[in-house]
Amino acid sequence: MVANKVLNGSLRRRAAELGIDIIEGVAVDRFEVGAATVAVRLADGVTLDARLLVAADGVRSRLREMAGIKTVEWDYGQSGIVCTVVHERPHGGRAEEHFLPAGPFATLPLKPDEQGRNRSSIVWTERREDAERIVAEDDLVFEVELEQRFGLKLGEISVDGPRRAWPLGLTLARGFVKPRFALAGDAAHGIHPIAGQGLNLGFKDAAALAEVVVEADRLGQDIGALDVLEDYERWRRFDTVQMGVTTDVLNRLFSNDFGPLRTLRDIGLGIVDRLPRLKDFFISQAAGTGEGIPRLLKGEAI
């Protein structure tokens, strides 16, 4: 797993190499779609014109709201606690996810830091009121709570850096595109982190949209035309809905200590482990591979 600040740093350096301007700290005030372009007016009064506006501004997307695209959504009553921990022993590149009554507890391997310390990223799901209480505790109490779930398999642990919690829910846009407008990433779909697939879905969106736009431009088509953008929507919509439903069912099944459901989930895990093709499907989804993968994610040029 790559730390967010490392990924952001790499993207910024690449953008600078390509001469891409990054405008920060200025919100979009409004946008207007014309026959050949879309005009985006920023809060500082600057207007930008383009053939296509891509909204990738998060699960509470203001641009999606401005475009009038509705969503299907519900709240899980859970929050995800995120932090980085330093531990004595190396993780060996192993990611783990444990299913607890309040929700999944995932340990994701990170590269050692500049001092060579072993590190992992934690995504820890709790009932919302408990998550708020845990995050507000002092460092010692927080680390005790964390150790109860993390265990001592990697030796002593300590929290490295800030910790935060964010509310979890399911949000699926009813449509991904309009003329000269496309949703991507969390603006199109916000899912439960139980399978760690939110970022992978966003990468697939970006790669698929890039492939559709490049191919349309190569053929002399208008990249902002609705029929072009609908190719992107058809490509990505089924995958995102499928993953949203899958994570919703898994969360309801595993984040539960009700006796019959506990038995059912144990049976379900046993079935998956004994059927290679079914197991391969879940592994391919977790790895962000499988059918319908854009060429960029396979390392191919477009």
Show the residue positions of the predicted features.
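A conserved short coil-to-beta-strand element within the FAD-binding core of flavoproteins
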Residues: E24-V38
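General small-molecule cofactor/ligand-binding pocket signal
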Residues: D21-I23, R164
